[in-house]
Amino acid sequence: MATTQPCLIGQIIAVPQFHILFSPRNSLKPELSTNKRTNFSVSIGLRHSFASSISTCNPKAPSLSCLRNCAAVDGADTSSSEDKWDWDWDRWNRHFSEIEEVESVVSLLKSQLEDAVEKEDFEEAVKLKQAISEATVDDAVAEIMRQLQTAVNEERYHDASRLCNETGSGLVGWWVGLPRDSEEPFGRIVHITPGVGRFIGKSYSPRQLVAEAAGTPLFEIFVIKDTDGGYVMQVVYVQHVKQNLTISENSFSKVQQSSKSSINDPSILDVRGSELKVDKKEDTQLNAGEPTEEGIKNVIKFLKDKIPGLKLKVMDVIKIPEEEIVGSDDATEELVGEGTEETNSSDDEEEVEEEENDSIEAISSMDSADYGKHSNTKLVIGGVLHNIEDSSIDDEIVRVSANIMDTERDSFILHVPGRSKRDIDTRKNRVSKEQVTALAAQGLSDLLPPEVAEAFWGEKASLKVSKHVHEIVKLAINQAQKGNHLSEYTAFNRIITPESNLDPFDGLYVGAFGPYGTEIVQLKRKYGRWDDAEGSNSSDIEFFEYVEAVKLTGDPNVPAGQVTFRARIGNGSRMTNHGLFPEELGVLASYRGQGKIADFGFKKPRWVEGKLLKLNGKGMGPYVKGADLGFLYIGPEQSFLVLFNRLRLPE
């Protein structure tokens, strides 16, 4: 293809202001001439190189000097220098845009490189690799990582430590963040990785980690090199805009749906980090059907198959007023609430309180099948939050100045100025009872097997939703509106995992706790005694080996950072009687322990007896497959089993 520009071959994409990053002399200059725009471009054809209207470089062999000549056109007339310490926020914003432009070009070149390698066009691959190196020649982060690797290889640990402290490179890795100035119960799993011109901290939900999905950018650390050869960092918090809660009013006009519609064609509930949408197909309404006797039997059989000896209390099901909200207790949910004739609001509240005092037992379980391919399915009666996570956020972003303080080897604090506790915690929104009922209906349709979910829906009866489920849904919607919002101070601690997975009692696990969805816990072996054990002043204090599981993500009952269970695992601690558990569950060993439960809002936290189960990973039936561990919480009123699968963090 003929062209008048010596450095240009193939189809061209112009990259405005790409030149700013390629001249070390001009990297400190905030103002560059705009009336002398360079035709800096990159080819996306089979042959590629960089182009300039004044360059005479060989198009078949783009060189570093060619790249810099192309980049230096606009900077030639700029004689004043500026220290990056003097950059104002507008100048930083321009730098952010420039970095994004470079990153898009590098991403394009890497994509071409992968295609060339796949086609075994190694000559083209070499050229593309050289082009990538030239495009990132002034990338401060790439230079820092090279220097760090060289210092470690040459055992210059003092230089390596200095780089880690001064450039943010020591923060690369996995972290868990907990708010310091907010009562929010949820922790954040964050992965900090080096990128083009910056270190990127991405937040991951348990579902994103299980599905190996891309994380959501939470904060960034931009690094630039000053005139003295040192480095300057600028931390920014990535705030997602357009986070308005959009729920169609028509979606909640009715809360009844036929059994087939609720199972096969339910409303689509979509939460994208900070945006909650309910999309409804035409002429589709939420209707409730009449549960059949066979359907109720399917429900009971399904639950009793999970845990032997499970006791269920089933009441009569009759017409329930739409305005009525109802019944579950914490992480366990009622199967069917006792219905009454339409009454006033005060009678409804009294009925709800009476029903919540009934001792109705249920079991929460999880489906660990196909963890890597699909979102895991958990069995939770009345669950409403399992399937409303999503890994993508399409909102526009706004960068807000932040800073990192109290940096240690395995901890640091992210400070976002101006984000007070009052601003974070007081943004509450009213949710109608119709919305709550619709969300609960959707949750049942998604969570239960068809024959089980169908039993809950009929032509005349509707499922009553408890006060606690109402609060759960309100919390979910509030979280959806808050999205990726951080508190003003967030303390991060490094997640240290074992190099191998040979020890079942050391590492990360993912499990489902009641209706709150999947959560991540970290197991660690310890030796000593439990802090709240009785007889602490006694002379015969017993020390023993035990395993402790700490929640990294958390839920409104037991928040992140709390111990969720512990069990003795030393010599003589293994229990021999496995007759209480079905053979299909695959129990290899069991250990006596304790589990922590609490009321909503982490009220009345208490320890209950429990058993830690080591499983063979084969599972039982189509609903529970591949679980590695389980913990049975034995409460005074009800017991429930939580199954865990080992979680391996991506490198």
UniProtKB/Swiss-Prot annotation:
Keywords: Chloroplast, Plastid, Stress response, Transit peptide. This is Protein EXECUTER 2, chloroplastic. Transmembrane segments: none annotated. GO terms for biological process: singlet oxygen-mediated programmed cell death. Pfam families: Cyclin_D1_bind. GO terms for cellular component: chloroplast; thylakoid membrane. The keyword tRNA-binding does not apply. Together with EX1, enables higher plants to perceive singlet oxygen as a stress signal in plastid that activates a genetically determined nuclear stress response program which triggers a programmed cell death (PCD). This transfer of singlet oxygen-induced stress-related signals from the plastid to the nucleus that triggers genetically controlled PCD pathway is unique to photosynthetic eukaryotes and operates under mild stress conditions, impeding photosystem II (PSII) without causing photooxidative damage of the plant. Residues 1-69 form a transit peptide. Residues 103-138 form the UVR domain. InterPro entries: EX1/2. Residues 330-359 are annotated as: Disordered. The keyword Chloroplast applies. It comes from Arabidopsis thaliana. It is found in: Plastid, Chloroplast. The gene is EX2.
